[in-house]
Amino acid sequence: MTQPPHPSRSASHLLPRGEKDGLSRRFMLGAPLALAACDRFATAQPAPGPLAAPLKDIVPAPFGTIGMTWQLDQQDWIEQVRRHCTQMTPEWEQKMERTLGPGFTYDFSASDRVVGFARDNGLRVHGHTLIWYSQGGEVFNDAVVPRARFATEYERYIRAFAGRYRGQMAGWDVVNEPVSEDGTGLRECHWSRALGMDGYMVRAFQIAKEADPDTVLFLNEYNLENIPQKGATFLKLVERLLKLGAPIEGIGTQSHLSIEIPDGNIRTFFRDAASLGLPIHVSELDFSLFRDGGRMPDLRSLKEKRAQQVARVGELAEAFHALPERQRYAFTTWGLRDQDSWLTREEGRNRPDDSPVLLDREGRGNPAYQAVVNAFTGRAGA
């Protein structure tokens, strides 16, 4: 399988979601518009100085970002990763689209490169992802594959991939995005049709644990804060799968935030999630200034959008900080600098004026960065 094109030429395969329609579900609003100008985070200002203080020294847990093979020879990116990060998640290199070929053949070479880079730079690695309904697995969709072989190849793939990095991964997203878009139920997919709605997840976790007993196994999902019903459905799923024997050991909340969700949604989800007692990973944090990534009309001023963004990111950081220390697995942004985010590089969207992560293009902290600093250092509202 060839190396993916650089995002400036093609990015359809880089989408962290399996978006096939014109709407970005990351920005579905699960509640009415809530302006945050009066929120105590809304007055946060950009961090002073030419470079932001290292996030790894501020976040009360491992701070991580994503990496792709084409970034591994970019010295400016490498310097920022070394400055800020203690963890790395492969953005695309461990998705089945890249690792599984015709005839159930494997190619883990791109994954090996990112894992090797992380190891060489003293970063721990969070694996992403073993089983997902999107971006790969077409060989399993072949109608001529007998069910018995389907189950055999499913287990063989998980065992081979997780076992390849036995003892090297801090954690794995074993199953990614099992809940339906609106949060009312579970997502039907080729895995559930062949192996059962709960069965495919239980078996994936069991095989992953056999292959790598010491890694922390996560169920990962998006829009858990944006859509309260989805958060509730997800947590009930975790409880049910645990009772069925799935060794789920962590909760991943992607936190692709709509900055317009009401004050309190994020705190409520984190409180409810913490009650399960499992480690929590803020696994894919970003927060576009634009509705639906710029596809929807938006008359708000930049000042209004920044105020909402700062308020929501600050709320998230406070909610994470409030967790017991043993439940703070990691805090990961989906891109380290604005230019690294899929939201600014996606073909057809490409909003260079967006600011969806914590560092700007020069590595300086933006207002959301300062909100995170304030939350983690107890200076919110100061």
PLM region spans:
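Aromatic-rich peripheral "rim/lid" segments of glycoside hydrolase catalytic domains that contact
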Residues: D173, E177-A194, N265-D272, L285-A382
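Conserved, mostly hydrophobic/aromatic
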Residues: M88, A118, W172, I251, ...
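N-terminal secretory signal peptides and thylakoid transit peptides that target proteins
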Residues: D21-D39
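C-terminal segment of N-terminal export signals and the immediately downstream linker at the start
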Residues: D21-G22, D39-I66
